[in-house]
Curated annotation (Swiss-Prot):
The active site is at E99 (proton acceptor), C347 (s-methylcysteine intermediate). Pfam families: Radical_SAM, RlmN_N. It comes from Pelodictyon phaeoclathratiforme (strain DSM 5477 / BU-1). Coiled coil: none annotated. S-adenosyl-L-methionine binds at G171, E172, S204, S227, L228, H229, N304. It catalyses: adenosine(2503) in 23S rRNA + 2 reduced [2Fe-2S]-[ferredoxin] + 2 S-adenosyl-L-methionine = 2-methyladenosine(2503) in 23S rRNA + 5'-deoxyadenosine + L-methionine + 2 oxidized [2Fe-2S]-[ferredoxin] + S-adenosyl-L-homocysteine; adenosine(37) in tRNA + 2 reduced [2Fe-2S]-[ferredoxin] + 2 S-adenosyl-L-methionine = 2-methyladenosine(37) in tRNA + 5'-deoxyadenosine + L-methionine + 2 oxidized [2Fe-2S]-[ferredoxin] + S-adenosyl-L-homocysteine. Disulfide bonds join C112-C347. [4Fe-4S] cluster binds at C119, C123, C126. This is Probable dual-specificity RNA methyltransferase RlmN. The keyword Phosphoprotein does not apply. One of its GO terms (biological process) is tRNA methylation.
Amino acid sequence: MSEQQQNITDLTLTELQQALSLLGEPAFRATQIHQWLFSHHAASFEEMTILSLALRKKLSESFSIHPLKRVEHQECFEEDCESPTEKILLELQDKSRVESVLIATENRRTACVSSQIGCPLQCPFCATGQMGFRRNLTAGEITGQIYALNELVGAKEPGKSLTNIVFMGMGEPLLNTGNVIEAIETLSTRNYRFCLSQKRITISTVGVIPEIQRLGKSGMKTKLAVSLHAADQQKRESLMPIASRQYPLKELGTALSEYTQSTGMPVTIVYLLLKGINDSLDDAKMLARFSKTFLCKINLIDYNSIINIKFKPVYSATRDMFQQYLINSGLHVTIRKSYGTTINAACGQLATASMQNPQ
């Protein structure tokens, strides 16, 4: 099978119908093929026994099916969870690699998936940003992560499946919006065995304003989380230099206000507390002022240590002071627990030496 063949899982139903038409096949075959791909997770065309031998031959000559290959699997147990947090390293068709995480708590089984190989935004506190940007993931590579994590769930809890998906892995989802939306539409359609409500899917972004506006007009029901980390423009530029200069705070606040008004849904503001940098009372006051301009809730996150990166987490007393000021200001604030820190699976940690392509 030629590696130059297009992976058929990257085609939308309409695109597959058009491709089959060129092969002289009726449109309804596309639905049958998608059922085999997304309900039965067929790893080869030979498994699609409902199709004729002649059609299977045509498909194998024109397309490939390339399931993501698991090359590494790590897990660690959290104090308050019976099930471990699990991280998998997946190899793609071009031998690139990407990490995905399964977070299992009492009532939820959450997939944390990647949208890019590396990240172009170069935030200095994030391991993924230090590995540079290689390429966007295709829709098929995104859904492939979900199916790989869902298999982990089913192996340990027969009959169970993922309950939530968060696009908080490697990369900036809203710099790959088209493929992310296509993957979400596949994962949330009732046409396939795996069907998850869009309300259980969260897209995290640094604040890519044009794409936030696009989401607001799309009619999608996904949740939106915005990584803010500072409510002062100059300070945010030091922490998120590329994102903050391209999408300034003032314009971002306006876009989020318009988003919440058009969708009726709150935005989650994610704020990573860094010792001596963005953890002062003045920082809390600026965050409160910014967040009161639109419907939102705030997630405070403790910094997860990363090798060769010198930021430090705040003391618990500082974090509590910061949180209490926001609460006293009338805001809804939670401290988000980090999972998988010991296996570098927590927020900002996805990128290790094993991410390098094998020599």
